[in-house]
Every structure is written in C-alpha cells, then in structure tokens.
C-alpha cells in the first residue's frame, strides 16, 4: 500500500529502536513524493540494499538523510526538529552520489533545524565519562548536547550560518563548554572557518521548513515521514533517563515538521517479533541465557551506527500496548518474524506484577520497573523456514496464530510482515 494520497503517512519505531523502519520506509518511498525526517540526527541508521536490472546489489547507508532518496522521483526533507551535523550530512551525501544516487535538487533542509558542532561531540564523550557506571550509552555523535543547547536557547540553527554574528556566537558557545568541562583540545577558529565554507555549499538546500511542509500537504503531495529511534527512547515517554534527547513519538512528528496533527492519516508502528535494546536502561524481558544469545546470533543483532551488540529478549506486549496508546498506530509492521523459525516454543510478555499486584500501564519509576515480575504467555513455534513466504496464506498456522495473538492483545492489525533482510522479503497482508 502506498503512502496516503490525502495526507501524511508516518512510520514510527514502537519499541527501543532497530525495529527495521528503514526497510518499510524504503518500500513506501517508492510511491511517495516527499520523504521527511522530523527528529534526531545522525545517531539513527539503517542500510538499504538495492538490486539493479543485472541482479547486482548496491548497499546504501543512511544516518541523517531520509532514505526516500533511493526513489529518484522522491524529494527528501530534513525538518526543523532534526539536529544537523553538516560535515556528516555532506559525507553521507557524497558517499551516496559516488554510488550513483543523484541527489541534486531533491534534498531540502529546514532553516530552523539546529546544528551539531564538533564541540558537542566532544562534550558527549566527556559527559559519558563523567557519568561512569551510570552512563546512558549514547552514540557520542553530539546529539544530546546539541539538543541541550537548543533547550537552553543558546543553540545555533541553520539560518545562523549566514548571520554575520555567527563566529561570535560560536566562540561564546565554546567558551561556555570550557567553563563547564575544563579546557579540552578544540580548534575553535578552524571549526568556524570550516562551517562558513560549508554554509555556501548548504545554501541551495535551505528552505523555510514550515512553509515547505504546508505547501506539500496542501498541494496533495504524498508525504512519508521517517521516524527516528523509537517510542521507548522518547524524552518524555521512554525509560528516562535512558532515552534519546528528542521527541520520537507522534507528537515529535507534528512539532518537528510544523504540520497540523489533522494532516496525519496513517501511523504505522514498526515492531520486531522479539525485543532488542542497545546501551543501558531497563529491559524487562531481556534474556541473558540461551534464548537471548540465539536471538542475537540468528537476528544478527549489532547496532548499525555503533556496532554494539544488541541486548535481546522475548516480545514485550506491555511495552507495545503503552506504545500503541501514545502513538495511535493505525496498523503494524511486524519485522524479523523469520528469526523465530527455530524455536519450539515462543514466549510473549502479557503483563507485569509487583509484589503480586498487576501493574497498570508502564511504570515511569525505574526502581518500580526493576521490581516487575513479567507475566508470559507461551505459544507453540512453527519450526519452518518462512523466509520464502510471499503471502499470508503461506505462513504456517502457528505463525498466523502468533500474529493474531499480537493483533488481539493490541487491537491493531498487522499490515506488513518481514521474513528476511531483502526488500522483497516483506509480506503485505492488506
């Protein structure tokens, strides 16, 4: 199914990230006019593999740029809620163009997007060292410190690059970091010179962000929004403080792009058939024994950006119910179902108890969350290779039962099912 012809389609991560959003975005972007990023920075990441007419494969890595650029007819937009590390943006752009992807005239950046500077990245590392054993496990890309600058009203936005006061504002920001963290090695004047050079290269891409999106929506363009990270990493609704620094929920789409909530017609929640998490923080269904190791190995669970091993465990429907409540998914994309092919039995978390009392919702207090006793339902496995299934009817009955169990618990239909890493390994149910 294509993006909504009468509004905006949003793809959001429903767990702790790494659900496989990029693959669905890639598929939907084939029929989109505009693909937009609304939040986050180059801390997100996924790889798309494209096969040409000769059967040759080309791999494209996306971190900051919207992956809709794969479609030569699609325009990409980086919204006001994104934080942009300009050197990384052009490095990614140059890499894509060296692989034959023509981007000229198809990429636009909001003038209101905040900038990630080199000192933000240094500070990111210093903060992690300072936290020691309580570190959050960031990607050290400077995302958090850039959002901190934004929240404290001292950050620099894209349009500031063309302001004569940019060098003075930049120096003031660096001096503030020196006062906080001590004098670290940083070439302030060299960084200013580099950014002023980048500014001229960036100029053709810059637009008035809210006006760009308003015109797109009002002219009937098919808009696809590519969410970054996931709901459980949201600054307000995730497992705070083990979260990212932006709004990764449906609310972040509205504020990050400057669009009306009434423009959004479809919200697809992407949910992995089991659960993974990178870095520190609560993970009620984490399995540190055989199950977790099997999921990690079979699912090749290593972070796209950091290369870190992902923590693994059974699907947590308590998390998913909470995620669904906040984001209001109109349908689901269940990914990596094939990873469960080898299990005799599959467990699914259906509730939490603390001291024998059922917990309503998802606890905000991490001390309470650490005490939960996870309640599981056990479903029979299917012990069949489903990686070649092309239709829902081809799935084993127990795989269908697993999908239905999820649908019944959440009250949302599964629309897409991923059965392998390939673009063509995606079953569309409706």
Curated annotation (Swiss-Prot):
One GO CC term, this protein: cytoplasm
Binding positions (substrate): 304-310
GO function terms (MF aspect): adenylosuccinate synthase activity; AMP binding; DNA replication origin binding; GMP binding; GTP binding; magnesium ion binding
Keywords tagged on the record: Cytoplasm, GTP-binding, Ligase, Magnesium, Metal-binding, Nucleotide-binding, Purine biosynthesis
Cofactor binding notes: Binds 1 Mg(2+) ion per subunit.
InterPro entries for the chain: Adenylosuccin_syn_GTP-bd, Adenylosuccin_syn_Lys_AS, Adenylosuccinate_synth_dom1, Adenylosuccinate_synth_dom2, Adenylosuccinate_synth_dom3, Adenylosuccinate_synthetase, P-loop_NTPase
The protein's name: Adenylosuccinate synthetase
